[in-house]
Amino acid sequence: MEGRKSGNKELYTKRVHEYDQVINQILKHEQNILSLIKKDTFGAAYKRLVLADDMIYLTTLYLAKFRLSVVLLGGKNENILNEARKTLYKPIIYLEEIVTDLIDAPFSEYEEGVAQISKITEKQRFYLIRKLGLAINLVIDAYGENTKWRWSFIDIEARFAVVAKNIMDLKEISQTGLNPHAEDYDTVIYHLRLVKKLFTKAADKYREKYEIVTNNISDFRNAILFLEGLKRVHMVSNEHREVEEVKRKIDIWKDKMEKDLKQKDKSKK
């Protein structure tokens, strides 16, 4: 039994060393690209897309190290898992730097950023978003349900929802992408469907966070803001019935928020 444990530790050390070498290479490459962006902003948006993709891969490497500790050492290494969680923010930030973090805004307000990645096809954008979404889900699943980070994951998922929407060229999509004969029609539909699902989840989770944990009105406002963003996506998709349904939900939530605000004011007096 002791020999088996010793063998597992040796294998763990060897495999971790291999992963660490790749991790260090990625981190070095990240710093090199950031230095290039600082010196010359030409093509910066494409460079940030590369960085976002690299950081998704980096997250999976930390997850692989974490699984090694579970399989070979029989325990969860929270430090490694925390590195994966912290790394998740990086691809989101790099995407925000390109397409902004605007939750509910006319496309014209962030169109300039989207135009900087015009050579990236809708299929490539959707693939990147799906990879990021998978990495987020894997990290959340690795922590399990009873984690202290449960409520902070809401912010990660919400920010992910925003870049998933903003990376789309909604102007082009509204003009040609919703044509069933368009080349990327299926991809556009699947991407929009994912965005609507993510925005609905973000709104519900912020409302849940407000009701159960914080009682902070800013969480309620965020919930409503995501509903407003969801309504805008339905409008782009020409889904009039869904627009009206979300409008009614917004009105109900706003009414509840106003009542809660009045109650808070009364309690202060």
Q: Which residues fall in each region the model found?
A:
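Heptad-repeat amphipathic alpha-helical coiled-coil interaction surface used
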Residues: 66, 92, 196, 203, ...
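Helix-loop junctions that connect tandem helical modules in alpha-solenoid scaffolds
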Residues: 40-45, 206-215, 260
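Leu/Val/Ala/Ile-rich N-terminal alpha-helices, chiefly Sec-type signal peptides and the beginnings
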Residues: 1-104
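Amphipathic alpha-helical repeat scaffolds of TPR domains
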Residues: 46-74, 89-211
